[in-house]
Amino acid sequence: MKQVLKKTNYAQAINDEILEKLSLKNRYAWVNNNLQSILTPEQFGFFRKVQRFCLKFEKNNNITHSTDEDIYSWIPDFGAEGFISRFHKFEMIDLNYDPYGAVPDFLRNLAMDMFDPQFAMAGGATVLAINPLHEHHDNIPIRLEALKDMATGKAPGCICITEPERGSDAVHQLTTCDEQPDGSFLLNGRKIYNTNAPKSKWAVVYATAEQNNGNQMAQFLIDTSWEGWNCERVFIPWVPKVHLGHEILENLRVPKEYILGEVGKGRDHLFEGLIPERIGIAAMAIAECWGALSFAAIYANMRKQFDQMILLFQGVGFLLTELWAKTSNLTWGIFKFCEAFDEKMEKFGGQLPANLSRALVSSASQFKFHCTALTREVCYECANLMGGAGLCDNTLMHDYLNISRIQEIVGGSRQIQQYIMSMALRQLFKMI
């Protein structure tokens, strides 16, 4: 048997014919046939542009998606093509992306997630640091430099909210910021589970002038080369190629021009980022569903047992169609949300009214809640339908199975999303 895939020193478990059919090119073709009808020619053209780059990058760099590959070394190439974020135009740093917005970013995310889900997750964490800088750069040179570094892939970024003793309770932080006579601040405290932190040049950090007082929060841009920034890696076995951090801040001095949100403004800045963060996680989760479905659907059409393809057995085919229908319907929902978000942003000049923003926060939580629950189901069931082929290292299915286990936790747990939605129901009642 000719070996067509060399990922590790372990065996090739899937035969050549099926393995070749499971190529990225064919999986893209399968998804394209599903989505082409809902995309405009311009949207589909951009989607294909990202796909073509991923295919070329995989081939030219002999990417096997093995567990020992350094996904962070890929970032500069993707950044140079404008594929780190398409949520904004970035005219203030002379990028002037076209297209841009929630819809193009969703399509970028989908194409990149099918290329490598762990790489897409790491890229999403950089976007979380990009967004507050985009909103609060105030044309200050160092902030624009950091924004351009991250948007163009010159350096990864991270956002530091979670603390060892403050997970879901993000507004009662223990990390402190003490203002100095020269207008700078000294930061002291600990952060944890911050994606990309050990690899990042730039970090957006939240701290408070008074512990446990959300009204005294501030937001800072940090250069991780500064004295007082200490970071070690937290290893998450589900995503072995993604580096998360545990940061110890010891008298970390932040100059005045790096203060993105003064004391009292940090909480507002934190909440304004919830919509793009949660819809981004939802988009990533639905992308994982499509990735897993593409593997399982192709495999089920080729694998034979009892002298017929396994797709024709109701236990396989009917389950696969159920997962396909659920994924398709949620994709329509996210796509419509992204279109509406882009329309509202254009209508209101990039600043959503407070009441509309609150409504969209609850909608984003709904999608985050539903999509992350679905990816947990879809990725497991697709791997199960593929049997051993869905668990071995010959394909990306094991990556989808692993990463889907953590999406409900990332960016606010399932229970927090339910709490947010319950508060929204309370507000809707009060409006009657």
Show where each model-derived region lies:
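N-terminal glycine-rich flavin-associated loop
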Residues: P117-P141, G167-A170, P181
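A short, Trp-centered hydrophobic/proline-enriched beta-strand micro-motif
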Residues: T152-T162
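Charged, glycine-rich active-site and insertion segments that engage polyanionic ligands
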Residues: L356-A389
